[in-house]
Amino acid sequence: MANRSEAPATHLHGSPDTPQVRGSWLARGKDGRLSVYLPRNGGAVRWTEGADGGWSGPEAIGGGSGGLLPSLSVGQGADGYVHLVGLRPVAGGEPDRVELVHSTQYQTGRPALEWRSITHPNGAAFRWTGTPSVTVDGIGRAYVFCRNGGGGISVRAQKDAGGWHPWWDLLGSKTDPLPVAVTNGSGFVELYSSHAAGLVRYVQRESGAKPLREELLPAPVTMGTMGAVRGPSGHVTAFYLDREGRVCAWSPERGLAPTPLVDAAGEGPLTVVHRSVDGVDHTLIAQRDASGRVVFASYPAEREGAELRWSAPGPEVQGPPALRSDASGGLVAAAVAAGGEPIVARGQDGPDAVPGAWARV
């Protein structure tokens, strides 16, 4: 329950040199242009793609310097609206007391709303308990999931007519500080997390309803490695590293038990995207290898028996990359280079193709 103390030993706020950024921080607007979002200088900044393919920025958003920690979680709905969630120390509070803050960008390149507090699952001033994950349901309502002080999961959801519901305690204990939220093909939200003893999923069965916790599935999981994607069936597949260092897939709605796919390239989180190449659906997985360089592996979507091979290493990066399709369906990847600046690359042709030359935005 949320009133018990179970704070994780490691704080994943990020640092000025290595920001913590999660979710859809590479976004595509209704006009097809891309945006990149990162935490910087106590706030959040944005780079925006122009009509000619060039980039402008960085530009402060959400009211400029808002005293934020270097952590940013991003979600985007089908309406193109980008929801940003940061962590902010509580003014006058004790050290390590934080609240979650939210902003929305409605249109590519346009100003975002001022940061507004959505408090914390345990109250207005509670210590860091986990890094939020954001997803947007089928009718445009944002859901902000966060590990709470009892080690379970809480969520705060937007109302239809504006404003927010109170924090809902979804129960659980000893969950991963880095949960992964995703919206399925029915427009309902799901939350995937790991536990010391296995895997756990929270599922929304009706529009706007509180997600429900399912039974723990025993499995050897490495915390902090999970990613998830909606596939061509509309069902979600979660990916994670097991304790033998293998990338595994799990899709409850498809009846897919935890299935090893390939030896992991490194130890950190996975990023996953669904893409279509010549009419064939593929799942692309990205990870930092043991040397800190980004690598990719692809297989036909929802065919977990297919062979996977990691690509040749790309540039050295900080943290996992972001992946998405551009307006023409081509693959785009974004990452934070070793020096702290964002870099992007476009995919090449073919189902096994990976992003090509990387360039600074």
Residue ranges and their predicted role:
Residues 1-361:
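A structural motif
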